[in-house]
């Protein structure tokens, strides 16, 4: 793997060392943050028929310039704001508004751009709340759970990207040392190897087909329950980019 991509691995491994434990303060903060974001989204008037909009994106970006987009499963299994910082550790235990939150905020790989071929988004497995952050991703390990939750949206500043889940599996520390899955722009050979590995490890039967080297992918990562040496990865293939009605001026 490339030198740049290998350097990213340290941040990923450190991320999963932070086991989230029950914290009453964090639970209260998380619920307040989620309620506020939901209210901002509902108050918009530009596209009331859509679950998100350019107007909502602008308001949340004004509140936190690190805000990149809103990740939402069509089933609403997960609905989380996505931030990006210069440091992958920045939002491990920080709420969207900057206060302390043991469950942190879902964040995008610091070295990636929205035009990267592989965008990795990290979220905690929260032991005390099975609906928080990326904890619900474990439901996709079951075939029926995957089929019920296979469509994913990423709402950005001027468009919505639609993805289909194509693979779900666990990756070990040893495997992650070789396959630097969070690397945003792998070489052609690295990407080819990674896609082949994805399809080999996949534990689901993807209805819409396997991942392909021609795909742009969104990788969702969380920890495995009671095992910090492994991470669960959900691989999503991008299938469309659609501008909001009325447009917008870029993705930030």
Report residues per predicted region.
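N-terminal Sec-pathway targeting helices
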Residues: 1-9
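Solvent-exposed, non-transmembrane regions of membrane-associated and secreted proteins
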Residues: 13-252
């Amino acid at each position: 793997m490339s030198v740049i991509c290998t350097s990213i691995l340290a941040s990923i491994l450190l991320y999963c060392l932070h086991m989230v434990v029950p914290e009453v303060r964090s639970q209260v903060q998380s619920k307040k943050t989620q309620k506020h974001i939901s209210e901002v989204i509902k108050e918009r008037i530009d596209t009331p028929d859509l679950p998100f909009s350019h107007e909502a994106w602008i308001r949340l970006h004004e509140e936190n310039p690190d805000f990149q987009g809103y990740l939402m499963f069509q089933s609403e299994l997960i609905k989380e704001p996505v931030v990006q910082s210069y440091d992958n550790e920045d939002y491990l235990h920080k709420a969207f508004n900057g206060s302390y939150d043991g469950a942190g905020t879902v964040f995008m790989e610091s070295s990636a751009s929205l035009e990267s071929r592989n965008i990795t988004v990290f979220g905690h497995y929260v032991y005390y709340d099975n609906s928080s952050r990326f904890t619900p991703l474990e439901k996709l390990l079951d075939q029926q759970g995957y089929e019920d939750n296979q469509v994913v949206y990423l709402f950005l500043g001027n468009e919505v990207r639609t993805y289909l889940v194509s693979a779900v599996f666990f990756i070990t520390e040893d495997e992650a040392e070789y396959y630097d899955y969070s690397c945003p722009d792998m070489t052609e050979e690295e990407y080819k190897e990674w896609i082949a590995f994805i399809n080999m490890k996949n534990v689901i039967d993807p209805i819409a087909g396997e991942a392909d080297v021609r795909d742009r992918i969104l990788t969702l990562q969380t920890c495995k329950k009671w095992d910090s040496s492994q991470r669960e990865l959900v691989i999503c293939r991008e299938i469309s980019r659609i501008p909001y009605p009325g447009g917008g001026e870029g993705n930030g």
